[in-house]
Structure formats: C-alpha cells, structure tokens
Swiss-Prot record:
Membrane-spanning ranges: none
Oligomeric form and interacting partners: Component of the 7-subunit TFIIH core complex composed of XPB/ERCC3, XPD/ERCC2, GTF2H1, GTF2H2, GTF2H3, GTF2H4 and GTF2H5, which is active in NER. The core complex associates with the 3-subunit CDK-activating kinase (CAK) module composed of CCNH/cyclin H, CDK7 and MNAT1 to form the 10-subunit holoenzyme (holo-TFIIH) active in transcription.
Annotated compartments: Nucleus; Cytoplasm
Any matching Pfam family: Tfb5
Gene3D superfamilies named among the record's database cross-references: TFB5-like (3.30.70.1220)
Entry GO CC: cytoplasm; nucleolus; transcription factor TFIID complex; transcription factor TFIIH core complex
Residues bearing PTM Phosphothreonine: 69
Name of the featured protein: General transcription factor IIH subunit 5
Record GO biological process: cellular response to gamma radiation; maturation of SSU-rRNA from tricistronic rRNA transcript (SSU-rRNA, 5.8S rRNA, LSU-rRNA); nucleotide-excision repair; nucleotide-excision repair, preincision complex assembly; transcription elongation by RNA polymerase I; transcription initiation at RNA polymerase II promoter
Reported function: Component of the general transcription and DNA repair factor IIH (TFIIH) core complex, which is involved in general and transcription-coupled nucleotide excision repair (NER) of damaged DNA and, when complexed to CAK, in RNA transcription by RNA polymerase II. In NER, TFIIH acts by opening DNA around the lesion to allow the excision of the damaged oligonucleotide and its replacement by a new DNA fragment. In transcription, TFIIH has an essential role in transcription initiation.
Organism: Mus musculus (Mouse)
Domain of life: Eukaryota
Protein's UniProt keywords contain Nucleus: yes
Record keywords, A-Z: Cytoplasm, DNA damage, DNA repair, Host-virus interaction, Nucleus, Phosphoprotein, Transcription, Transcription regulation
Gene that this sequence comes from: Gtf2h5
Amino acid sequence: MVNVLKGVLIECDPAMKQFLLYLDEANALGKKFIIQDIDDTHVFVIAELVNVLQERVGELMDQNAFSLTQK
C-alpha cells in the first residue's frame, strides 16, 4: 500500500532547522509536521502547515530583533 502526502521542501540554515525540529518534537502545531529530515539544511514538511510555520518563524525573528530605539 502506498501513502501519499503533499509536502514542501524547506531549505534553511542549521539553526533554523533545529528550531523546526524542536517545534515538531514538541507538537507545537498540534501534530508532527516534518515528513522527512533530509540533511543539515533541508526538511520535507506537510504542505498544509507551511503558513503556520512561517508565522512561528516570524514570531521567533521578531523576538530576536532589536529596534534602534531600544537600549
């Protein structure tokens, strides 16, 4: 029997990949979303969760960014 899943290949740096692996292990999106961990910079994820992943990555980037007015 063949199971077919629609997915998206994501290329990122190793640090971002570790964040994605953390989200996957913690079931932060309600279910596992990584279909295949390919190598150091690539993961294959469920296509329907890509928008949610982009939001989570955006939140992480906002937390790590500093504005010029902050001291």
